[in-house]
Amino acid sequence: MRIMVAMSGGVDSSVVAARLVAEGHEVVGATLQLYDSRESARKGACCAGRDIHDARRVADRLGIPHYVIDAETRFRQSVIETFADAYAGGETPVPCVACNQGVKFTDLLGIARDLGAEAMATGHYVRRIEGPDGAELHRPVDEGRDQSWFLFATTRQQLEFLRFPLGDMPDKAAVRAEAERFGLSVAAKPDSQDLCFVPDGSYARVVEALRPEMAGEGEIVDGSGRVVGRHDGVTRFTVGQSRRLGDAAMRDGARQMVVGIDPASRRVVIGPRTGSAVRDLSLRDMNWLIDPPEGDLRCLVQIRAREAARPATVRRTADGASVTLDEAAMPAPGQACVLYDGSRVLGGGFIRRREMAGAAA
């Protein structure tokens, strides 16, 4: 089988390529260039200049062709600009979902088809299982590296074409050991950290550089609109956060947290967790990996990347879905809400922003 491997230059995708070559497949490697080469050597980024070099070294070692795809403009428009716009709208976005669904699983997958590939493989930690109604997306064996939450927007058609060979690996140590057995130069290469386009972990700095109107101090207010403090920029906050509140962090003997953000007025609304948590969510941009349910769907939902899934009832609506959690939580607008049945991903969408009392100036 002719298979394209999306090679990031890291150990995971390199092992995928090596394993497929060893299995006798006709393998083609491809790496996305997401940044200008003069800016792409920053530590902790993926798809940067050093990573392209590492991917090419691995491809040479394996004796496979390797292509570098210039995706800088597309990445900036569909991922970075969208990320900044979401923050400007008071949301906490998940740019990795946009990157996977757009640049990788639409653009790169299309190139794979153009090159005559019958499948595209990646180093993601998820499992693709053939079910009675086609390919299913599942959590990996190594749940500590589970990336299924970030891949919920993968369509059923894309899933038929994709392969995830690392989904059954027990842990990262086993992947590195396999890389050493194949003699790959990246066997000990560190994992990429944080968002690839945020070199120092400061989301606020990136957003404020792209949207200067977002910079500047503002008010911290309670649910009634009363000013209880000041902050150094709304881009530094997300719903559910309790850090950076200063003297407003404790009120009336209760620990406070962010319950709403209004970028237009630069107001951060705070309140105690008790009384601020919600059970009802509204989702937009739904992607279903099953036939959409006609009635109530009982399932587990995960509302943050590193939170445990929780029981809920989901209902399809004309413009997305509604979710009723069994127990109240603090969902952040713009984050993904992914639906699970055990290990299987059923679909998901993005949490809509709610109007908050106290936000208006």
UniProtKB/Swiss-Prot annotation:
Which key words tag this protein in UniProt?
A: ATP-binding, Cytoplasm, Disulfide bond, Nucleotide-binding, RNA-binding, Transferase, tRNA processing, tRNA-binding
The first-level EC class reads transferase
Q: What is its main location?
A: cytoplasm
Which chain positions carry the site (Interaction with tRNA)?
H124, Q335
- Region Interaction with tRNA: list its residue ranges: 145-147
Pfam short name (any one): tRNA_Me_trans_M
List the subcellular locations: Cytoplasm
Give the annotated active site.
C99, C196
- State the EC number(s): 2.8.1.13
Disulphide bonds annotated for this chain are C99-C196
- MF-aspect GO terms: ATP binding; tRNA binding; tRNA-uridine 2-sulfurtransferase activity
Q: Residues of the signal sequence?
A: none
- The domain of life for this entry's organism is Bacteria
- BP terms from Gene Ontology: tRNA wobble position uridine thiolation
Q: Which residues bind ATP?
A: A6, M7, S8, G9, G10, V11, D12, S13, L32, G123
* Annotated Gene Ontology cellular component terms: cytoplasm
User: According to its UniProt record, which reaction does this protein catalyse?
Assistant: S-sulfanyl-L-cysteinyl-[protein] + uridine(34) in tRNA + AH2 + ATP = 2-thiouridine(34) in tRNA + L-cysteinyl-[protein] + A + AMP + diphosphate + H(+)
| HAMAP family assigned to the protein according to its UniProt record, in alphabetical order | tRNA_thiouridyl_MnmA
Quote the function comment for this protein.
Catalyzes the 2-thiolation of uridine at the wobble position (U34) of tRNA, leading to the formation of s(2)U34.
Member of which family?
A: Belongs to the MnmA/TRMU family.
What is this protein called in UniProt?
Answer: tRNA-specific 2-thiouridylase MnmA
The taxonomy runs: Bacteria, Pseudomonadati, Pseudomonadota, Alphaproteobacteria, Acetobacterales
Q: Which gene encodes it?
A: mnmA
